[in-house]
Design a protein with these regions (language model features):
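Catalytic cores of nucleotide-sugar-dependent glycosyltransferases that transfer UDP/GDP/TDP-activated
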Residues: 1-179
């Protein structure tokens, strides 16, 4: 770390601070976003539920009032998929729904496709990436998973917070700094 400057940076740590990534609050605004079904805000949150029902319908999920857990990620060990995979069935034993959007290691793609086949109407494994669907997921989910092993900063937690979706993340890197 620090490109050979670790010692100098540590000795000056009292007067240094990191600069976080950021998101465009104009483009990522639940009050104006062109990708979502119904606009909403903290003052008028009822549109979030309408987005959830629309997403459930679009993805073939049962239209129910249960927690909708989402994950938008690259399917790789760094993103904590290897930590999550062994507990997916335990998670699904609860009355929840799960939506995944992302691609990556073929073994993890298979894991999520298999999960979807075991829990029809409750799991939607979308093994691709689509910006419009990502926005709809951020605007619709109740909880957003980010089990990353390391994350220099991360953006998913910022998008989820912007759209009123509670992030659940490992305490690491930028996730610890922004949640």
């Amino acid at each position: 770390y620090g490109y050979g400057m670790d010692g100098i940076l540590r000795s000056r740590s009292d007067c240094l601070c990191g600069i976080l990534n950021g998101i465009d609050f104009t483009a990522n605004n639940p009050e104006t976003d062109g990708f979502i079904v119904k606009h909403f805000s903290a003052a008028h949150p009822e549109g979030k539920a309408e987005n959830k029902y629309a997403l459930q319908k679009r993805l073939g999920l049962e239209e129910r009032e249960v927690p909708l857990i989402a994950m938008i990620t690259r399917l790789a060990d760094q993103k904590g998929v290897d930590i999550l995979a062994p507990v997916l069935d335990e998670m699904m034993r609860r009355d929840v729904q799960f939506v995944l959007l992302g691609t990556g290691e073929p073994s993890y793609e298979y894991t999520f496709r298999s999960l979807q086949s075991r829990y029809p109407g409750r799991v939607s494994a979308n093994i691709f990436f689509d910006e419009a669907l990502a926005q709809q997921i951020y605007a619709s989910a109740d909880l957003f998973l980010m089990p990353s092993k390391f994350e220099p900063c991360g953006l998913g937690q910022m998008f989820s917070l912007r759209f009123g979706t509670v992030p659940i993340a490992r305490k690491t890197g930028g996730l610890a700094d922004t949640i």
